[in-house]
Amino acid sequence: MNRLQVELPGLSLKNPIIPASGCFGFGREYAQFYDLSVLGSIMIKATTEQPRYGNPTPRVAETPGGMLNAIGLQNPGLEKVMNSELPWLEQFDLPIIANVAGSQAEDYVAVAKEISKAPNVHALELNISCPNVKTGGIAFGTNPEIAADLTKRVKEVSEVPVYVKLSPNVANIVEIAKAIENAGADGLTMINTLLGMRLDLKTAKPILANRTGGLSGPAIKPVAIRMVHEVSQAVNIPIIGMGGIETAEDVIEFFYAGASAVAVGTANFIDPFVCPTIIEELPALLDELGFDHISECQGRSWKQTCHSR
């Protein structure tokens, strides 16, 4: 029995550990360190219809407990991803989750329609929550009606299940999650980065050229846990949880909150082996906590009927 196997819409995962989009590129750099086939899946870098060069530099700043980034969805564009990056990933035994972005709804629809045809793309992740772009991005993720409409339009053209990435920079994340579920989403991924800023002590100006950036890393984990806990009780579609995950213990905490799988982001920059390390350590942690299978942990913080052996 594979104690870590997880079944989600469109995704049969040998384990629930997925490198998060934007922190793993298309996997080429990390493939120099280990066989990517050990992973549950990969959320590839956001893809837009046309190439994007991203925001001006500097666009990364360290903070206590994390980092700020304002990359601006830099990517080689749909054609390059379809003709080069996705074919390269076919050598690995794992389903790919393609992250889809755009400036307007038509962009999302165009990318989703084409990229969902790739043989190794088993699901889409709609990036409606990036805080670092002037148009699109978070603009789609802060209004329930707009988020639902975009979800519905993408579902109509996608050949694979659609997951929607939620922004924490909202007043009521549950309301948005329910609207997206009602529009036909197959799952949710959450949370994206929190909007933040750092100032230079000598100039008193923002360190990032974009002024603001997305905060990620351990600092945001309590926020992510709280939001997963709230949303998982309000919807009936699976959640891939993310936000500050660094250890096997972090993974279990997200499962307790209600996640069915997790994505590891910023920690990949600190330790390129973090994902395989977590995968290796999870079975012993399940033994320690008294669980036969990781699915027994899902929603344990609020499911009264969930008990360890």
UniProtKB/Swiss-Prot annotation:
Binding site for FMN: S21, K45, A46, N99, N127, K165, I191, G217, G243, G244, G265, T266
Xref: InterPro entries: Aldolase_TIM, DHO_dehydrogenase, DHOD_1B, Dihydroorotate_DH_1, Dihydroorotate_DH_1_2, Dihydroorotate_DH_cat, Dihydroorotate_DH_CS, Dihydroorotate_DH_I
Needed cofactors: FMN
Active site: C130
Compartments where found: Cytoplasm
Pfam families: DHO_dh
Cofactor remark from the record: Binds 1 FMN per subunit.
Catalytic class of the enzyme: oxidoreductase
Domain of life: Bacteria
EC number(s) given by UniProt: 1.3.1.14
Family: Belongs to the dihydroorotate dehydrogenase family. Type 1 subfamily.
NCBIfam families: PRK07259.1 (NF005574), pyrD_sub1_fam (TIGR01037)
Protein name, entry field: Dihydroorotate dehydrogenase B (NAD(+)), catalytic subunit
Source organism of this protein record: Bacillus anthracis
Gene field: pyrD
